[in-house]
A protein has these predicted regions:
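Rossmann-fold NAD(P)-binding glycine/threonine-rich loop
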Residues: 66-81, 88-129
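N-terminal glycine-/serine-/threonine-rich beta1-alpha1-beta2 phosphate-ribose binding loop
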Residues: 1-81
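Glycine-enriched alpha-helix->loop->beta-strand junction motifs that scaffold or abut catalytic
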Residues: 81-84, 145
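Short, glycine/acidic-enriched loop or turn micro-motifs at the edges of active sites
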Residues: 61, 65, 92, 148
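Active-site catalytic pocket residues across diverse enzymes, especially alpha/beta-hydrolases
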Residues: 6-10, 96, 104, 131, ...
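General beta-strand structural signal in soluble alpha/beta enzymes
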Residues: 44-46, 61-62, 86-88, 111-115, ...
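Core active-site phosphate/anionic-ligand binding loop and the adjoining beta-turn-alpha structural block
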Residues: 97-98, 110-172
Length: 172
C-alpha cells in the first residue's frame, strides 16, 4: 500500500519537498505470498538487511512490526550504516527508542516514528520544532491512538474495557 501511495503521489511529494522519491527495493517476510500490489519483480529484495549496506539507499522505511527479529535488526543496522529510518513500529520504539535515538544522533541521521505515536497525530514534530526552546527530556502518558480510542469509548459510550478493546481491534 505504501509503495502504491508513493508511486501515485510522486508529483505531490515533489511539489511539497522538492524531492522525487525513488523506491529502490521492496522486501517482505514472505516473498511468495500473493499480494494485490503491482510491484515489479526486479524491486523485490530477498534479504532486506542488504539494503542497509548499499550506498544508493538513503532511507529505510520499516513497516514490519514487532520489537524483535528482522524489524529490530533492520532498524539498528540501517542507523549504524548511516541510513535515515522511518517506522510506524510502536513495539520497537517503545522498547528500543532511546537506544535507536542515540545511534541516530551519533550517526547524524533521522529516526522518524511519528506514525507510531498518538495515532499518527503530528505530536512529535510539534514538540521537536514548536517547543524547541523548552528543555523537554521525556514525556510520560498515553500517546497511542488505540489506547486513546479505548479510553474515550469507555467514557463516552460507557463501554466496558473488554468491549471497547474488541471494538478497537475490529476497527484496526
Amino acid at each position: 500500500y505504501f509503495y502504491n501511495y508513493l508511486k501515485k503521489n510522486k508529483k505531490i511529494l515533489f511539489n511539497k519537498t522538492n524531492i522525487i522519491p525513488n523506491i529502490l527495493f521492496v522486501s517482505a517476510k514472505s516473498l511468495s505470498k500473493k499480494r494485490s500490489l503491482k510491484i515489479p519483480k526486479k524491486l523485490w529484495l530477498k534479504n532486506c538487511l542488504l539494503a542497509t549496506r548499499l550506498k544508493e539507499v538513503d532511507i529505510i522505511i520499516e513497516l514490519i512490526g514487532g520489537s524483535e527479529g528482522i524489524a529490530k535488526k533492520l532498524v539498528f543496522e540501517a542507523l549504524k550504516n548511516k541510513k535515515h529510518v522511518i517506522t510506524a513500529n510502536k513495539a520497537l520504539i517503545a522498547k528500543y527508542g532511546d537506544q535507536l535515538a542515540k545511534i541516530a544522533e551519533k550517526n547524524k541521521v533521522n529516526l522518524e516514528f511519528e506514525a507510531a505515536v498518538c495515532g499518527g497525530i503530528p505530536i512529535i514534530r510539534s514538540i521537536k520544532e514548536g517547543l524547541i526552546a523548552n528543555n523537554i527530556n521525556k514525556i510520560y502518558g498515553i500517546l497511542n491512538g488505540t489506547s486513546n480510542y479505548i479510553l474515550s469509548s469507555m467514557d463516552k459510550d460507557k463501554l466496558e474495557y473488554k468491549d471497547s478493546l474488541l471494538k478497537a481491534k475490529s476497527l484496526g
